[in-house]
Structures are given as C-alpha cells and as structure tokens.
Design a protein with these regions (language model features):
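A short glycine-rich, His/Asp/Glu-containing loop-to-beta-strand
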Residues: 2-39, 43-44
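A structural signal for the main folded, soluble domain(s) of proteins
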Residues: 16-19, 26, 50-53, 72, ...
Length: 133
C-alpha cells in the first residue's frame, strides 16, 4: 500500500511504492538510533542515503555512509543502519524479491527488546533508555 507510514522506536518509514516484485520505502532514522541487526529470507534490499550520516553493517563489516552513498544488502545478509549524527538520517530502500511483509525479519540484535522476533513494535525512542519495548 503506497503512502502508508509507520512509526518505529528508531524513527519511521513511508511506503512509496508496493507492487509485485518490488517495494520502495523512505526511511527516517532519528539521531542516536539504529535499526535492528536483522536479515530477510525472501528479499534483497538496496539503500540510497539522501540525507544525514551514519554507519551500515552487513554481515559484521561496517562502513560509514552519507548523502549519496549506495549500499546493496543481499538476501539473507545480516544488516543494520545506525545514525550516530545529530540530525535525521534518511534513505530510500528498494526491496526486491517475492515477499515484502514486515514479518520477514529475523532480528539478531535489537536495542528495543525485539531480538528473535519478526514483530514490528511501534514505541517511543525513550524505550531504548528505559528498558521498555
């Protein structure tokens, strides 16, 4: 469904396009937040950073990213993006595969108590510091 926005503990995403074969999202990561270290069984992803700075980790290897950086995340690769800056980090994510549900997430590590689940929980960024998820 295009135009759908979801809040997450680390920020938010908006679905820009969702059609058979691919899905496109705009993802905004709040300062000092990061996504789960996760992998997907049924999709690959391509990220293009449009604003901010941060760090991407893929299968244990980290690299800095900033506006203009492009990153390929192969299907099954463990990955995360972190915003260590003081402004939002925004990137466009293009998913390619045969299934794009939010339940195709295996969380390996998560700052918000969701590791080991595919459950997308929306909560405030304060949950990371208070221990609530």
């Amino acid at each position: 469904m295009s135009g759908m926005s979801e809040q997450r503990p680390w920020g938010s995403y908006t679905v820009l396009e969702d059609v058979p074969g691919y899905k496109v999202k705009r993802i905004d990561v709040l300062p000092s937040q990061r996504l789960s270290y996760q992998r997907h069984a049924r999709r690959a992803e391509h990220w293009f950073v449009v604003a901010g700075t941060g760090e991407v980790t893929i299968d244990g290897r980290s690299m800095p990213v900033s506006a203009g950086t492009s990153v390929d995340v192969p299907r099954g690769a463990a990955h995360r993006i972190a915003n260590f800056g003081d402004v939002e980090l925004t990137f466009i994510e293009v998913q390619h595969g045969d299934y794009f549900g939010e339940d195709d997430i295996e969380r390996l590590d998560d700052d918000y108590g969701r590791a080991g689940t595919g459950e997308p929980q929306a909560s405030s960024p304060a949950a990371a510091t208070t221990g609530r998820s």
